C-alpha cells in the first residue's frame, strides 16, 4: 500500500502541457468523464519542491490556463513526493537557495541573455503568481 495520496488513475494530464518539468498539471476523472477540478503540483521532491525561475514560469502558465478555462471550477495546488533522497514530503519549501546569486535568483547554467526573456532574468516572478492565485475567480 502506497502512502502517496495521489492516485494517477483518477487524473489525466492536461493536453498541451506535456513539456512541463517542474510542475505537473492534471484534470480529475470520474467514471471516465472530466471533472471541473485540476491539480497543479510542484514536481521537485528531491529539493522539497523548492522553486526556481523555471518552476515559477510553469506555475504561472498552468494557473493562468486554469483561470481562463471556463470548465475548470477548482484548482488544487499541491506538491509531489516523496523525495527519493529520504522519503520526505513537502508542499513547497520556498525558493531554491542553491541557485540564488548575489543579484538574486539565476536561470539554469548554460542559459544566456540571448536565450532567456530579459524581463525574467535574475529574479523570480513569484509575486505575479501570488497575485494570480489571490485574484483567481475560482477556489485554489
Describe the residue ranges of each PLM region:
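Glycine- (often His-adjacent) and acidic-residue-rich active-site loop
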Residues: 47, 79-131
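Charged catalytic carboxylate motif
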Residues: 54, 58, 125, 132
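Hydrophobic core positions within the conserved protein kinase catalytic domain
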Residues: 63, 130-133
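Solvent-exposed polar/charged
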Residues: 68, 134-135
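A short, small-residue-rich loop immediately preceding and capping a beta-strand
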Residues: 137-140
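Conserved CoA-thioester-binding segment of acyl-CoA-metabolizing enzymes
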Residues: 1-83
Amino acid at each position: 500500500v502506497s502512502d502517496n495520496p495521489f492516485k494517477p488513475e483518477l487524473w489525466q494530464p492536461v493536453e498541451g502541457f506535456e513539456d512541463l518539468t517542474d510542475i505537473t498539471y492534471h484534470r480529475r476523472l470520474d467514471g471516465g468523464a472530466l471533472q471541473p477540478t485540476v491539480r497543479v503540483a510542484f514536481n521537485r521532491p528531491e529539493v522539497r519542491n523548492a522553486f526556481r525561475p523555471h518552476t515559477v514560469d510553469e506555475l504561472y502558465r498552468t494557473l493562468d490556463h486554469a483561470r481562463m478555462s471556463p470548465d475548470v471550477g477548482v484548482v488544487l495546488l499541491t506538491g509531489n513526493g516523496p523525495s527519493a533522497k529520504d522519503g520526505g514530503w513537502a508542499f513547497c519549501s520556498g525558493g531554491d537557495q542553491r541557485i540564488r546569486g548575489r543579484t538574486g535568483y539565476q536561470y539554469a547554467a548554460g542559459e544566456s541573455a540571448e536565450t532567456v526573456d530579459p524581463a525574467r532574468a535574475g529574479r523570480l516572478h513569484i509575486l505575479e503568481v501570488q497575485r494570480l492565485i489571490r485574484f483567481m475567480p475560482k477556489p485554489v
